[in-house]
């Protein structure tokens, strides 16, 4: 398995070490800002209802929802070569996020995040 693309990164390190009772908002906000910036050029109409996002990702990847499971799945399949680092981080974020933070207004309903996920889901279909 080739983990080189997703190890040695502070976002991935954070996802792997996150405690159930705490969220480092500074790291998350920095991550979200990078994701939002990168998604600005995506199709404005490419949105998915927020409540379907996590369910759809887990369904397509057959995951148990754990971050370790996500990383293992990505690294042991063609996804490692098909997804960009941003898309990998996006996938990790939505599978590992905690509800209190995910549903925060301005984060959960941000359309640029939905566009990033829409693009990712299309790519997941063509990867497998």
Residue ranges and their predicted role:
Residues 1-22:
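Short, extreme N-terminal segment that most often corresponds to the first beta-strand
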Residues 4, 80-99:
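Short amphipathic alpha-helical heptad-repeat segments
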Residues 8, 17-19, 27-36:
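Long alpha-helical scaffold regions
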Residues 9, 24-25, 84-87:
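Intrinsically disordered, low-complexity coil/linker segments enriched for acidic/polar
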Residues 20-27, 41-48, 79-81, 100-111:
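Charged, low-complexity interaction regions
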Residues 44, 48-65, 113-124:
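Repeat-associated, polar segments at repeat-unit boundaries in modular proteins
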Residues 93-128:
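Amphipathic alpha-helical binding modules
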